[in-house]
Amino acid sequence: MVLEYQQREGKGSSSKSMPPDSSSTTIHTCSEAQTGEDKGLLDPHLSVLELLSKTGHSPSPMGQNLVTSIDISGNHNVNDSISGSWQAIQPLDLGASFIPERCSSQTTNGSILSSSDTSEEEQELLQAPAADIINIIKQGQEGANVVSPSHPFKQLQKIISLPLPGKEKTPFNEQDDDGDEDEAFEEDSVTITKSLTSSTNSFVMPKLSLTQKNPVFRLLILGRTGSSFYQSIPKEYQSLFELPKYHDSATFPQYTGIVIIFQELREMVSLLNRIVQYSPGKPVIPICQPGQVIQVKNVLKSFLRNKLVKLLFPPVVVTNKRDLKKMFQRLQDLSLEYGEDVNEEDNDDEAIHTKSRSYCRNKKAENSKKKSPKSNKKPKRKKQKFFTSWFTWGISITIGISFGCCVTYFVTAAYEHQTVKSLSLRPSILASLLSLDSSSDTINTPATASPSSTEQFLWFDKGTLQINFHSDGFIMKSLTIIKETWGKMNTFVLHALSKPLKFLENLNKSSEFSIDESNRILALGYILL
């Protein structure tokens, strides 16, 4: 351990007032006669454990005023036994205990060496990064860790501040008030740098200072209507927000995020410029008026693109109670996570921004999960409609085919038992099919001449209509009827389209369309349906 302190000239006689118990320790004092020698350097072979294990004396009042502050990242517990052992080290033992060979009346620097490489450790301490030193200054008198960049894990250095007595005070004089203590702390102080290497038996000192508070999740409300908005917040969420006590923009870095409430876009831009000036990269939550969401998003795009601010929550309309409730619930969850992870994560705005982005991703995943049951139900409904439509179409097609088959069979049976006036010899079915002409209604046979179309067929003759279900040539008769029907329908459609106004007249005047033929076409039309 290395002790660096500065002693006043009038403290040379402080060794006279040493307590009698100090003689039992392993630290020897020098006599007043040895004024020309070095004084302030202790035995280099003493270790920290030997100083902590010395017994037989009670801590002096000056030793009780010892102020120690060790900042060890990730360890926030206080060990009273170790802190008591440190308080047992008396300032007079540190200031008035010398080695006879190295005593001097002049102001010198003393050191307690725990190893032989203290010069390298001091050099590494002096070569510490400037950012670590600035961090120590900002934290005030409580100290901070100074870790060398070359040996981040092999060496642990801590800074402890010890108060020394005033000019006119004896070692056992009690201080009257706290003001004298502060003056003595500011004027006379000893900086002890303890270096623990991996080669020695070392222990880790826990944090002894109870003045430093853990970071708290707090959001600052900015804007002219901030007070009214704060009053409208439910009481269970008001602890997360805070109004500015002093109109000082320098307090922005102390808060986790900033809530911006405004009525005009110019006010929003001015508030964002203040935040960027005093605390760049701070997470913000804009609360706008109805109808300003799109304009607010356009303004935020430029700030977010340049990484001037970060968005902790999307813009919320002040009159939308539902979105405000979602925002309050989300911030409460963030505060709980922030309090749990404060010992493991750094207190910076980037971690908060990461949480906000993870929250957006989780929210999208939850929305997709909520939508998935609906998406599963929709195909079922489609399948039901699909089966229903197919069932309906199947029934209709079946009925249509059955009806058509019945009508076709009825017509073919009537065709077989028709009465022929002009035809003496009935031709065979195959000869009739081959000699059938689609343009005429005659059946040419080698034995007979072709009669007129009006005298060849007599359909639906009541006297001669006999249906024979066991007749031969059902397929050939069906093909003949279909072919004849197709030719008749073509002629009928052409005439109907060419002369729509004289449709009935054409039916009566035309020799090809008799009443019987029209009835036959009407009957065959049901087959097509």
UniProtKB/Swiss-Prot annotation:
Write out the biased-composition intervals (Basic and acidic residues): 1-11
Q: Which GO terms describe its biological process?
A: autophagy
The residues that cross the membrane are 389-411
Q: In this chain, where does the modification Phosphoserine occur? A: S114, S119
Q: Where is the composition biased (Polar residues)?
A: 25-34
Recite the UniProt keywords alphabetically: Autophagy, Membrane, Mitochondrion, Mitochondrion outer membrane, Phosphoprotein, Transmembrane, Transmembrane helix, Vacuole
Q: How does it sit in the membrane?
A: Single-pass membrane protein
Cellular compartment(s): Mitochondrion outer membrane; Vacuole membrane; Preautophagosomal structure membrane
In what way is this protein post-translationally modified?
Answer: Phosphorylation of Ser-114 and Ser-119 are critically important for mitophagy and for the ATG11-ATG32 interaction. Phosphorylation depends on both HOG1 and PBS2.
Q: Which GO terms describe its cellular component?
A: mitochondrial outer membrane; phagophore assembly site membrane; vacuolar membrane
What is the predominant subcellular site recorded for this chain? mitochondrion
The record's region (Disordered) falls at 1-41, 345-381
State where composition is biased (Basic residues). Answer: 370-381
Compositional bias ranges of the Low complexity kind = 12-24
What family classification does the UniProt entry report for this protein?
Belongs to the ATG32 family.
Q: What does this protein do?
A: Mitophagy-specific receptor that recruits the autophagic machinery to mitochondria and regulates selective degradation of mitochondria. Mitophagy contributes to regulate mitochondrial quantity and quality by eliminating the mitochondria to a basal level to fulfill cellular energy requirements and preventing excess ROS production. Recruits ATG11 to the surface of mitochondria. Also promotes autophagy-dependent peroxisome degradation.
Quaternary structure note: interacts with ATG8 and ATG11.
Q: What is this protein called?
A: Autophagy-related protein 32
Q: Which organism is it from?
A: Saccharomyces cerevisiae (strain RM11-1a) (Baker's yeast)
